[in-house]
A protein has these predicted regions:
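C-terminal substrate-recognition regions of SAM-dependent nucleic acid methyltransferases
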Residues: 29-32, 176-324, 332, 346-396
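Short, well-ordered loop/turn elements at secondary-structure boundaries
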Residues: 92, 124-125, 254, 310-313, ...
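Substrate-recognition/cap regions that form aromatic- and gly/pro-loop-enriched pockets
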Residues: 327-339
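Short, Lys/Arg-enriched, disordered terminal segments
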Residues: 1-5, 393-396
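Mid-to-C-terminal catalytic subdomains of enzymes
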Residues: 342-343
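Glycine-rich, often proline-containing surface loops adjacent to acidic residues and nearby aromatics
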Residues: 128-131, 253-258, 339
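Short glycine-enriched loop/turn motifs at secondary-structure junctions
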Residues: 8-10, 335-338, 383
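Signature of N6-adenine DNA methyltransferases within the class I
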Residues: 2-28, 35-59, 63-232
């Protein structure tokens, strides 16, 4: 990691590969015999140094956007092309490309995804792309179109998941190292932390399953409507036992009272006075535009009508972010908060559903391990929709 100010490191996504574990993994994943290697975001040269130590002298095409980075002694600045790699005019096709691209959010996703896309187009047939990237890459909506394209032209052959978010200085980032090979006829299997697994591509979302799992799988969205919870936009104001007008589920055993009114003033003078005391901060909420006609409204009354039409029916709730091993539970449909997703059975599903068995599968390590990041389970609506569940767990 450089000694640049932390703000600059974060702005440019400069999380250099000082970890011996990550450097060794990149070298281990090089299965071709390249004589010329592309490093599109060389930084100070950690990966190039490690490659030369492992394989001897190799020719490297190195690119870096920041000419102020102090290079390692083994890297000659004359051999580095300074500038924006994504705009370089390049025609050479590579047998091997390695890198730890910058992790910087953009309007459409993240800069490292753009690096993957550009480098994918620079691979020769049978070429390998070995990158260190945030571990949620294979679950991101913004990455799905790229992954769909990559899976038509090749596959991910190796993945290393350290499950350690402390591998970079001044940052907590859970990462994976992947090897992708541009060969469309390869089997859809992957060495995942030295265990051979089946690789499952569901419309650009990648999950993994045991080679011994021979039962069929079905998409959650084929059996459930997956709903996101409501967002008040100011919990300190709307969550109130004294003036609450409705109950909102925030966990398996947590149900809180919240204020939700359709019009102001309401029939409760004390409630009106309470809300008026917070009017300024409610108007200043940034979730959407608030003014004199809607300042007392919630930030996002998401799925209020859909939930209202299903109140009291059986459903499954899934925690979106938790370290608990129980991420799902069966309950009745009720209004619920933003920390959970609700799985409401579809009336036109292919089969009747056994919710208890479905919850058992969702809570199994087989399912959870696809969405664990340094011990934390994290899942979003699209990811859950595209997730596969064992059809024995869902059909009766």
């Amino acid at each position: 990691m450089s000694r640049h100010p932390t703000s600059k490191i974060h702005d440019k996504g400069q999380y250099f590969t000082s970890s011996p574990l990550l450097k060794q993994c990149v070298c281990n994943f090089v299965l071709n015999s390249p004589d010329r290697v592309l490093e599109p975001s060389v930084g100070r040269g950690d990966l190039v140094d490690s490659m030369q130590t492992t394989f001897g002298l190799l020719d490297f095409d190195m690119y870096e956007i920041d000419s102020n980075i102090k290079l390692l002694p083994c890297i000659d600045a004359k051999n580095v092309t300074y500038g924006d790699f994504l705009t370089q005019n390049m025609c050479y096709k590579y047998k091997t490309i390695i890198g730890n691209p910058p992790y910087v959010r953009t309007s459409t996703g993240n800069l490292y995804i753009d690096f993957i896309q550009r480098c994918h187009g620079l691979l020769e047939d049978g070429g390998e792309l070995i990158f260190i990237v945030p571990s949620d890459f294979m679950k991101l909506t913004s990455a799905a179109p790229l992954i769909r394209h990559m899976m038509t032209t090749g596959t991910f052959t190796h993945i290393f998941r350290p499950n350690d978010e402390k591998l970079f200085e001044n940052a907590s980032i859970d990462v994976i190292v992947f090897r992708y090979c541009l060969e469309p006829d390869l089997e859809r299997t992957v060495m995942y932390n030295n265990e051979l697994k089946r690789l499952i591509n569901t419309n650009g979302t990648i999950t993994f399953a045991s080679m011994h799992d021979t039962t069929g799988n079905v998409k959650i969205e084929d059996y459930f409507d997956v709903l996101v919870g409501m967002v008040s936009g100011r919990e300190s104001v709307f969550k109130n036992e004294q003036f609450g007008t409705m109950s909102v589920r925030n966990g398996k055993t947590t149900v809180d009272r919240y204020i939700m009114i359709d019009n102001f003033p309401s029939d409760n003078d004390e409630l009106n006075l309470y809300l008026l005391q917070h009017k300024t901060e409610l108007i200043e909420r940034k979730m959407r535009k608030f003014g004199e006609t809607n300042w007392f409204k919630w930030g996002a009354e998401r799925n209020y009508t859909k939930v209202s039409n299903k109140l009291g029916e059986d459903c499954i709730y899934v925690r979106m972010l938790t370290r608990d091993t129980e991420i799902a539970f069966v309950e009745k449909v009720s209004y619920f908060g933003a920390g959970m997703l609700a799985l409401i059975p579809k009336t036109d599903a292919p089969h009747k559903l056994d919710l208890t068995k479905t919850v058992m599968f969702l809570n199994s390590s087989q399912f959870r391990e696809n969405y664990l990041y340094s011990g934390r389970f994290k899942i979003g609506q699209r990811q859950l929709c595209k997730s596969l569940i064992n059809n024995i767990a869902t059909c009766t």
